[in-house]
C-alpha cells in the first residue's frame, strides 16, 4: 500500500512536460496500431478540454475581481506596456506573414465553399461584436465563455469591492485560491487528456488530407516559428535587456505545448495562470493580462489571415503592391484582435481581408474551406503561438518594471 501511494506521489510531483511527451508518443503509437481503439480514447481528450473550458470563465472572473478588490493603493499593474506589446506583436506577425508570402508565393486548389457560415461584413461589424460582448449579461458571459464580458464585469466588481471590509476581500481571496487549486488538479491530468487528443487526431485525420497543402503549411508554420523564435525574443530583449530565450523556451514548452493540443486559447487560460504563478509574476497584473491576451493578442491569427488572403490573391493572379500589402498587415492585425469575437475565429475573417483585393465572397469562402482542411495543424500552431506569447509579454513587462523600480 505504501509503495502504491509512493508511486502516486511520484506521478503527481513528476515533470509534467515529460509526462505530456509520454502521452503524445503513446497516442501516436495507439493510432498507428489501431484506429478503432484510438477513437475509443478520444473522450479522454474531450473531457480534459471540457474541464479546462469549464473552470476558465469562473477562474478569470473571481481572480480579476479578487486581485482588484485586494489591490493595495499605488500598486503598479503594468497593463499599458503589456497591451502595447500585444498590439506590436500582432502587427509584427502580420508583417512577417506578408514578407514570407511575397518571398514564397503560394497558389491554392480551391475547394467548395463552407456552408452555414456568415463572415463579418467589415471592420465595423467586428468592433460592434466586441462592444456588445463587453456589455453582455454577466451570467451569460460566464456560461458562454465570453472573456471580454467576464473581464468587464470582473473589473467592475473588483472596483466596487475595493472599499469593502477586509473580511469581504478575504472571502474573495480564499475563493480565488480554492479555484486555483482546482486548476492545478486539472492541469495534472494533461498527459491523459493529450494522449486522447493525439490518438483521436491521428486516427480521424492523419496527414494524408493535408499533404497537398505542403507549401501553404510551410509558409504558415515558417512565419509562426519566425515570430516565436526570432521576433518575440527580440521584443523581450529590448524590454528586459538580457538573454530572452530561457523565458521564451519555457513559455513555449509549458504553455505552447498544451495549447497546441487543446487548440483553445480559452482552455489554456488556467495553464497560463499557473505558469505566471510559477514565474512569480504580480497576480494583479497576470489576472487581467492573461484573459485579455486570449482576446486581443492574436499574432497567430494575423499570420493565418494574411497568408491565406495573399495565397488567394496569387491564385487569381492579382498583383499586390507594397502599399496594399502594408494595408493588409494593418487590417489583419486589427481583425485578428477581434478574432475571439467571431464564431470560427481567424478563418472567418479571411473574407474581410480578401475584400481589400476585390476578391468575391464566394472565392473567399473557398479559401476558408482550405483553412478548415489544414486546420488540424494551422489551428494548433496558431493557438500555441497566441497563448504562449501572452505569458512571454506579461513576464517581460513585469521584469522590465521591476528593473526600472530598482534603478529608480
From Swiss-Prot:
Similarity remark: Belongs to the dicarboxylate/amino acid:cation symporter (DAACS) (TC 2.A.23) family.
One GO-annotated biological process of the protein: threonine transport
Gene3D superfamilies, alphabetized: Sodium:dicarboxylate symporter
Topological category with respect to the lipid bilayer: Multi-pass membrane protein
Metal-binding as UniProt keyword: no
Keywords of the record: Amino-acid transport, Cell inner membrane, Cell membrane, Membrane, Symport, Transmembrane, Transmembrane helix, Transport
Chief location: membrane
Cited function: Involved in the import of serine and threonine into the cell, with the concomitant import of sodium (symport system).
Bilayer-spanning residue ranges: 11-31, 43-63, 82-102, 141-161, 192-212, 216-236, 290-310, 316-336, 363-383
Catalytic activity from the UniProt record: L-serine(in) + Na(+)(in) = L-serine(out) + Na(+)(out); L-threonine(in) + Na(+)(in) = L-threonine(out) + Na(+)(out)
Entry's localization field: Cell inner membrane
Name this protein carries in UniProt: Serine/threonine transporter SstT
GO MF term set: neutral L-amino acid:sodium symporter activity
PANTHER family: PROTON/GLUTAMATE-ASPARTATE SYMPORTER (PTHR42865), SERINE_THREONINE TRANSPORTER SSTT (PTHR42865:SF8)
GO CC, one annotated term: plasma membrane
Amino acid at each position: 500500500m505504501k509503495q502504491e501511494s509512493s508511486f502516486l506521489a511520484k506521478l503527481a510531483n513528476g515533470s509534467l512536460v515529460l509526462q505530456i511527451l509520454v502521452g503524445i508518443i503513446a497516442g501516436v503509437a495507439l493510432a498507428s496500431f489501431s484506429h478503432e481503439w484510438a477513437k475509443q480514447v478520444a473522450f479522454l481528450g474531450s473531457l480534459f478540454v471540457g474541464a479546462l473550458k469549464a473552470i476558465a470563465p469562473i477562474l478569470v472572473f473571481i481572480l480579476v475581481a479578487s486581485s482588484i478588490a485586494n489591490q493595495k493603493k499605488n500598486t503598479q499593474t503594468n497593463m499599458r506596456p503589456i497591451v502595447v506589446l500585444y498590439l506590436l506583436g500582432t502587427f509584427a506577425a502580420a508583417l512577417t506573414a506578408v514578407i514570407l508570402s511575397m518571398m514564397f508565393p503560394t497558389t491554392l486548389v480551391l475547394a467548395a465553399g463552407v456552408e452555414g457560415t456568415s463572415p463579418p461584413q467589415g471592420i465595423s461589424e467586428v468592433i460592434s461584436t466586441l462592444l456588445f460582448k463587453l456589455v453582455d449579461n454577466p451570467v451569460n458571459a460566464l456560461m458562454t465563455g465570453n472573456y471580454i464580458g467576464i473581464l468587464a464585469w470582473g473589473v467592475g466588481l473588483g472596483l466596487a469591492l475595493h472599499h469593502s471590509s477586509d473580511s469581504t476581500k478575504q472571502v474573495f481571496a480564499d475563493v480565488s485560491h480554492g479555484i486555483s487549486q482546482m486548476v492545478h488538479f486539472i492541469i495534472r491530468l494533461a498527459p491523459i487528456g493529450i494522449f486522447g487528443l493525439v490518438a483521436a487526431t491521428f486516427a480521424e485525420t492523419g496527414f494524408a488530407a493535408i499533404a497537398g497543402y505542403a507549401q501553404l503549411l510551410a509558409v504558415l508554420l515558417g512565419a509562426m516559428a519566425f515570430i516565436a523564435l526570432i521576433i518575440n525574443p527580440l521584443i523581450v530583449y529590448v524590454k528586459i535587456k538580457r538573454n530572452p530565450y530561457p523565458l521564451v523556451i519555457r513559455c513555449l514548452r509549458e504553455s505552447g505545448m498544451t495549447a497546441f493540443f487543446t487548440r483553445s486559447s480559452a482552455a489554456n487560460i488556467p495553464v497560463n495562470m499557473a505558469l505566471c504563478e510559477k514565474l512569480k509574476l504580480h497576480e494583479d497584473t497576470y489576472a487581467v493580462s492573461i484573459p485579455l491576451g486570449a482576446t486581443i493578442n492574436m499574432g497567430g491569427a494575423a499570420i493565418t489571415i494574411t497568408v491565406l488572403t495573399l495565397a488567394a490573391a496569387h491564385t487569381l493572379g492579382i498583383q499586390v503592391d507594397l502599399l496594399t500589402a502594408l494595408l493588409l498587415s494593418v487590417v489583419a492585425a486589427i481583425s485578428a484582435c477581434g478574432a475571439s469575437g467571431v464564431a470560427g475565429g481567424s478563418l472567418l475573417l479571411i473574407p474581410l481581408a480578401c475584400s481589400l483585393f476585390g476578391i468575391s465572397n464566394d472565392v473567399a469562402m473557398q479559401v476558408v474551406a482550405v483553412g478548415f482542411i489544414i486546420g488540424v495543424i494551422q489551428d494548433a500552431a496558431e493557438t500555441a503561438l497566441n497563448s504562449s506569447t501572452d505569458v512571454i509579454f506579461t513576464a517581460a513587462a513585469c521584469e522590465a518594471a521591476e528593473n526600472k523600480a530598482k534603478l529608480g
